[in-house]
Every structure is written in C-alpha cells, then in structure tokens.
Design a protein with these regions (language model features):
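Extended serine/threonine-enriched, polar tracts that run as long, contiguous segments within proteins
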Residues: 101-184
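OB-fold ssDNA-binding interfaces and closely related basic DNA-contact patches used
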Residues: 1-121, 174-179
Length: 184
C-alpha cells in the first residue's frame, strides 16, 4: 500500500548468486528439501555458530564464537576471551545498549552458517553457504543433528544429508504466527 516491500518468510529455499539458475534447474523453483554433503569434519568450517552484537545503527560492536570475542574499541577489534572475562557478553550489552537490550533481551544475535556441497547441482564445483538466525528453532535443530552424527560416526564429511525447511506455528498463547524452521 505504501510502495514498500518487506521480506517474507518462505517454506522453500531461494538460491542467490551467479549459480542460482543451476540450483533451480536441479531442484525446481520451490524446493523444501535439498541434499547436501559437508566437505569437512570440522564444525568451525562447515557448521559454525557466530555471536554478533550490533548497535542501533547496525554497526558491528563485537563478534565471536562463544569463547573468544573481537570487540571494537573505536579504532580496531581487540580479542577477549570468556575465560579471562566471564561477564564479557553482559558487559558489552551494558556499555552499548541496543534496542533489544532496552526491550529486556540480551542484545546478541546467534548466526549459524553451513558450508556444503550440493551434489545434484551440476556444472559447478564449489561450496554453497546457508545462514540462519533462528536461535530457538532452526539453529538447535541443525546443530543437534550435526553434533549427534559427528559424535556417533566420528565424521560428517561425505554423508548425504537432507536439509529441510517447513513452516512451524508459534506455541505462544494468542500468537498464531508462522515461521520457517530449517532442519538437517
């Protein structure tokens, strides 16, 4: 109505980039399941979680893996560890309160990035990435499956996984919102 477009959630994967037409040729325009293969067994390379803290203008104040964080000091990023500074994350939120902190949350975003090969996509050799911020839905689903297979078998490299997306409905009272959940 006002001419603005807003992002909408989908229950299918949307490829982007130079090789998107090859993805669409392999899976069609609205695939809800794709087969992927991890090229490495190292979680930090193929199933990496990152914590980010941004100010209200979108500036990246701090980021890290949950143990080591890089914090902007006004001129450069300086590395700190949770082992040395156990209250580091809360301290950053106190020093740089953003909208989320003012609304009663911790202000941090958790981002999961998967790096994988899609065997069905012919004509390109390389890895694809998928990123999600679904901290209480998609991230635990994917991470728990990845960790369980890695623990059970000792490796994930070369195993064909189904990466799925489907809508879930909120279980909160008086909230019938739908959101996509990705699972492995």
């Amino acid at each position: 109505r006002n001419g603005k477009e807003y992002p909408t959630s989908t229950d299918y994967f949307i490829p982007s980039g130079k090789y998107a037409p090859l993805f669409t040729k392999a899976f069609g325009p609205t695939p809800s399941t794709i087969q992927i293969v991890f090229p490495d067994n190292s979680p930090e390379k193929v199933c990496a979680e990152r914590y980010e803290y941004r100010d209200d203008a979108g500036g990246l104040v701090a980021y890290g893996d949950g143990q080591t964080f890089n914090v902007w000091n006004g001129q450069k990023y300086v590395s700190y560890t949770i082992a040395d500074y156990p209250e580091l994350m809360a301290g950053i939120a106190r020093k740089y309160p953003n909208r989320a902190v003012r609304a009663g949350f911790d202000g941090w975003n958790v981002i999961l990035t998967l790096t994988f090969v899609i065997p069905s996509v012919r004509g390109v050799a390389g890895v694809w990435t998928f990123t999600t911020k679904g901290a209480s839905s998609s991230i635990p689903q994917v991470r728990n499956t990845f960790d369980a297979i890695l623990e059970e078998k000792g490796f994930v490299r070369g195993i064909i996984f189904d990466l799925n997306v489907k809508f879930a409905t909120s279980q909160k009272p008086n909230n019938n919102s739908r959101y996509p959940v990705v699972s492995l």
